[in-house]
């Protein structure tokens, strides 16, 4: 249903910023969008390599001279926070996603990423959208915040635009703490939470 509704807005020529309900908005996100790509999305990555991409090596000794090859990898874009520019490519992307979800028992975030990043080949036609990854210290996931950013001296902490509590099950409590920390000046609001979901992390 979500992707059908998004397609309707795009068909009307409206650009769309979609945000899940487990997100704290600290600054106006419209002031921080670049609007130079079809899809501008938040990453589940937690550092430059996992968010923006890395080259990895494959070693097949049996190939001898050509034993070493390379691939590319990055973590998924989150299907709970993204901006879509209204055009034929993003309309096709939404259609590809919801048509698959009607037929497949699949997680929508997996299908969303497959349709964005997997390559057109043979009879398989992707929407071939252009992509920009939102900066992970502005559009933060909760792993970035609780595992790294909050440990920095306050003067060195970047001020986020939005914080998505997607990595932790106690979403409401962490959202309330982020509101107190960023919007109400409570310097101790984040301290009681573990970095991960387990005590001591």
What are these regions (language model features)?
Residues 47, 61-63, 167, 201:
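Functionally engaged cysteine thiol sites
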Residues 56-59, 118-119:
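Short alpha-helical linear motifs
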Residues 1-56, 76, 81-84, 88:
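GT-A fold catalytic core of metal-dependent nucleotide-sugar glycosyltransferases
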Residues 2-5, 25-26, 66-70, 145-151:
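Eukaryotic intrinsically disordered and solvent-exposed regulatory patches
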Residues 58-72:
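Short, flexible, basic/aromatic active-site loop/helix in glycosyltransferases
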């Amino acid at each position: 249903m979500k992707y059908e509704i998004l397609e309707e807005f795009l068909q009307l020529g409206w650009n769309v910023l979609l945000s899940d309900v487990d997100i704290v908005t600290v600054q106006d996100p419209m002031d921080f969008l670049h609007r130079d790509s079809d899809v501008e999305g938040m990453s589940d990555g937690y550092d430059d390599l996992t968010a923006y991409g890395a080259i990895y090596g494959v070693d097949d000794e049996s190939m001898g001279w050509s034993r070493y090859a390379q691939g590319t990898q990055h973590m998924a874009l989150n299907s709970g926070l993204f901006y879509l520019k209204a055009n034929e490519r993003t309309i096709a992307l939404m259609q590809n996603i919801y048509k698959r979800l009607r037929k497949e028992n699949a997680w929508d975030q997996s299908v969303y990423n497959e349709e964005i990043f997997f390559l057109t080949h043979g009879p398989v036609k992707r929407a071939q959208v252009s992509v920009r990854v939102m900066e992970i210290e502005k559009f933060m996931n909760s792993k970035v915040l609780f595992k790294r950013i909050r440990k920095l001296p306050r003067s060195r902490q970047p001020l986020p635009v939005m914080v998505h509590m997607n990595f932790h099950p106690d979403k409401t409590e962490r959202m309330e703490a982020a509101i107190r920390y960023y919007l109400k000046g409570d310097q101790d609001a984040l301290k009681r939470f573990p970095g991960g979901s387990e005590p001591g992390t």
